């Protein structure tokens, strides 16, 4: 491994506990040097939350750190090994262009990974160049910060630097490196890698590390690995329900993109739904619609079943008993997901208490929205505002009938109409990272070196539930339908 210029570490107290795991789980790998690093965007709010020195990170040494040109004294950068089912097909993977620089502890004691994405080739690059380009890195920055604003667990972006290098794709593009912050980068695919190419002892080491890092309560449970499985099932059910509630379509729900921490990761072909349609797909490579909006909950169950399979040797020494335990845990996913999703949908309609008829009320509204090609976000936004004029869906007889049933439903709870409206405002965003507004910001930044458009969008996305300061510009719909919008795995 080539030696790197070292920054005497007076600013960040980084360590790397992951290297205490079996060696086959990672490869020591320094980032590649880049030609001319320039800090394009820096997340001051995130840096402050993490207790990091903004002065250092924006200095020449800080920019060199973000680019991978210099490493901090005492750190051991690594690329992580993992496998995964990609569109249902199992394969060996690993960090092909991402390098874990180290871990830091925030001011409240939480541990976070610092990873450089686009930092050069690794032993897992599989013929790739290990590089990333500016547009997709800025896109991940925008979407991940938008998700954070929406209250959805997510990896975050600390900075994007341009590299001054050309990167060859279908055309020549500007190179870039993104600094990603995550509670960890342990994936379902990490467990699949050890399950297929490791020993039971190595699997146990990974599971114990994961428990210690994310689920310390497991120290007090009977079988901690059953607890681990159940907690991951719970966190994924909750995460995917949150995606569905805001119309987020991940686009590439492969098992290597399922984090054990329950954070959203990998924003390559993701997008937000405009017109409500469960069959909505944006990813250019998802030809059969495997990861369509309406399929995401059941794909979540499929991915979790793959995770459960990896844990079988730890669930019980008797394989039949272990399988029964795993099946019992996985069988709870559907009810968990439905509980989280229906609770969220009730909140979007200002409903506090639960009634069995609520499910029919919710599904009826979605059916009407689909029929009239209603915008998902703005339908709930306008319901919240009571703005029901001049929109086809609201003037239809079907909606008027539904509306009376909804209003009658609201009378069957103790809370006032004002309290119901407050609940709706907390759960129905006025803005989302609309696909065409994101593209608008990227074009200005990448082609014109104008980051003002991106910054204005980021400012709006910081508080998408703020009804006191709505920006109509970011709520307007694209002139053409969202069906024409396609995303690519650039990140």
UniProtKB/Swiss-Prot annotation:
InterPro entries: SelO (IPR003846)
Family according to the record: Belongs to the SELO family.
GO molecular function (one): AMPylase activity
Keywords: ATP-binding, Magnesium, Manganese, Metal-binding, Nucleotide-binding, Nucleotidyltransferase, Transferase
Active-site residues (renumbered): 256 (proton acceptor)
Species per Swiss-Prot/TrEMBL record: Clostridium botulinum (strain Eklund 17B / Type B)
Xref: NCBIfam families: PRK00029.1
Name the record gives this protein: Protein nucleotidyltransferase YdiU
Signal peptide from the UniProt entry: none
Reaction it catalyzes: L-seryl-[protein] + ATP = 3-O-(5'-adenylyl)-L-seryl-[protein] + diphosphate; L-threonyl-[protein] + ATP = 3-O-(5'-adenylyl)-L-threonyl-[protein] + diphosphate; L-tyrosyl-[protein] + ATP = O-(5'-adenylyl)-L-tyrosyl-[protein] + diphosphate; L-histidyl-[protein] + UTP = N(tele)-(5'-uridylyl)-L-histidyl-[protein] + diphosphate
């Amino acid at each position: 491994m080539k030696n790197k210029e070292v920054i005497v570490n007076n600013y960040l107290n980084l360590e790397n506990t992951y290297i205490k795991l079996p060696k086959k789980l990672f490869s020591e790998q320094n980032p590649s040097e880049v030609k001319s690093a320039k800090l394009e965007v820096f997340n001051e709010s995130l840096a402050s939350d993490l207790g990091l020195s903004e002065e250092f990170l924006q200095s020449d040494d800080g920019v060199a750190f973000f680019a991978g040109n210099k490493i901090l004294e005492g750190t051991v950068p690594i690329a992580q090994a993992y496998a995964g089912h990609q569109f249902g097909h199992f394969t060996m993977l690993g960090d092909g262009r991402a390098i874990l620089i180290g871990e830091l502890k925030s001011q409240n004691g939480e541990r976070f990974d610092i990873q450089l994405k686009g930092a050069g080739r690794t032993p897992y690059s599989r013929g790739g160049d290990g590089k990333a380009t500016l547009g997709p890195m800025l896109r991940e920055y925008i979407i991940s910060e938008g998700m954070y604003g929406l209250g959805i667990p997510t990896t975050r972006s600390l900075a994007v630097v341009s590299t001054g290098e050309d990167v060859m794709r279908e055309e020549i593009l500007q190179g870039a490196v993104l600094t990603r912050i995550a509670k960890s980068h342990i994936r379902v695919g990490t467990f699949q890698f050890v399950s297929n190419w490791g020993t039971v002892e190595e699997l146990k080491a990974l599971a114990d590390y994961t428990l210690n890092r994310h689920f310390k309560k497991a120290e007090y449970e009977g079988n901690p690995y059953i607890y681990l499985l159940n907690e991951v099932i719970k966190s994924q059910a909750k995460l995917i329900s949150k995606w569905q509630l805001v119309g987020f379509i991940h686009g590439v729900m492969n098992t290597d993109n399922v984090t054990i921490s329950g954070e959203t990761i990998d924003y390559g072909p993701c997008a937000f739904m405009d017109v409500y349609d469960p069959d909505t797909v944006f990813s250019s490579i998802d030809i059969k619609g495997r990861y369509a909006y309406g399929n995401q909950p059941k794909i979540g169950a499929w991915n979790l079943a793959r995770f459960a399979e990896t844990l079988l040797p730890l669930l019980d020494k008797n394989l039949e008993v272990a399988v029964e335990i795993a099946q019992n845990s996985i069988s709870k996913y559907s009810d968990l997901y439905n509980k989280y999703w229906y609770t969220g949908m009730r909140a979007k309609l200002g409903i506090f208490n639960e009634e069995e008829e609520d499910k029919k009320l919710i599904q009826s509204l979605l059916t009407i929205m689909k029929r009239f090609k209603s915008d998902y976000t703005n339908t709930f936004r306008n319901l919240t505002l009571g703005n029901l004029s001049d929109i086809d869906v609201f003037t239809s007889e079907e909606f008027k009938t539904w509306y009376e049933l909804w209003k009658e439903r609201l009378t069957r709870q103790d809370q006032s109409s004002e309290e119901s409206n407050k609940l709706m405002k907390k759960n129905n965003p006025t803005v989302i990272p609309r696909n065409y507004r994101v593209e608008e910001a990227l074009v200005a930044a990448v082609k014109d070196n104008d980051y003002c458009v991106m910054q204005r969008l980021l400012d709006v996305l910081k508080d998408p539930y703020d009804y006191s300061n709505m920006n109509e510009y970011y709520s307007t719909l694209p002139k053409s339908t969202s069906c024409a919008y396609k995303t690519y795995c650039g990140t």
